[in-house]
């Protein structure tokens, strides 16, 4: 019997590990995993870069609609897009049935690993990562219930999440 009664929602910078950590976390808890970006792509039958060509506002509206629907099913692990914090209504929706975890990865590690070509907001160059961090870091901190430092392996980060959320494995 599963003891988890809420969604586990991962927020953080692009490239911080939300999707890969989320998949591993969901597997270890034997619950569903949802990557919001993949749900958006599926809903619109377009890639994220194609969606952004219609404008960031179009993407954000769709993101909010998908979050509203997805967050009603629980328990599951949800990996959000990095910009989910730009609209506080998204946070309110997610907090109704979930605990929000900020995956904080050091910027030097993100910059070293990130593939910018499929990330529309940073496709102009890696310096955009620093600008996004300045814009969003305080939002991630203030909207999260728990902050986890992802500075080692993904497996270690999953263990940190499990310990902080007091989930028995």
Q: Where do the protein language model's features map onto the residues?
A:
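NTP-dependent small-molecule kinase module
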Residues: 1-3, 20, 24, 28, ...
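Hydrophobic anchor at the beta1->P-loop junction of P-loop NTPases
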Residues: 10
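P-loop (Walker A) phosphate-binding loop of NTP-binding proteins
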Residues: 13
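Conserved glycine(s) of the Walker
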Residues: 17
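Post-Walker A helix-loop "phosphate-sensing" segment adjacent to the P-loop in P-loop NTPases
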Residues: 27-38
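ATP-dependent small-molecule kinase phosphotransfer cores
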Residues: 38-84, 88-92, 134
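Short glycine-rich anion-binding loops that position phosphate/pyrophosphate groups of nucleotides
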Residues: 82-84, 106-108, 153
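A glycine- and Lys/Arg-enriched "phosphate-lid" helix/loop adjacent to the NTP-binding pocket
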Residues: 97-138
């Amino acid at each position: 019997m599963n003891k988890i009664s809420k969604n586990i929602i991962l927020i953080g910078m692009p490239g911080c590990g939300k999707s890969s950590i989320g998949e591993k976390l969901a597997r270890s808890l034997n619950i569903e995993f949802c990557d919001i970006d993949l749900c958006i792509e599926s809903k619109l039958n377009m890639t994220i870069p194609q969606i952004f060509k219609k404008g960031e506002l179009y993407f954000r509206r769709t993101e909010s609609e998908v979050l509203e629907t997805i967050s009603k099913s629980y328990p599951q692990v949800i990996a959000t897009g990095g910009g989910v914090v730009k609209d506080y209504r998204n946070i309110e929706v997610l907090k109704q049935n979930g605990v929000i975890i900020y995956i904080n990865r050091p910027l030097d590690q993100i910059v070293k690993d990130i593939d910018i070509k499929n990330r529309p907001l940073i496709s102009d160059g890696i310096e955009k990562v620093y600008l996004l961090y300045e814009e969003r870091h305080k939002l991630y901190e203030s909207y999260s219930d728990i902050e986890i430092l992802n500075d080692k392996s993904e497996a270690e980060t999953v263990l940190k999440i499990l310990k902080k959320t007091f989930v028995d494995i």
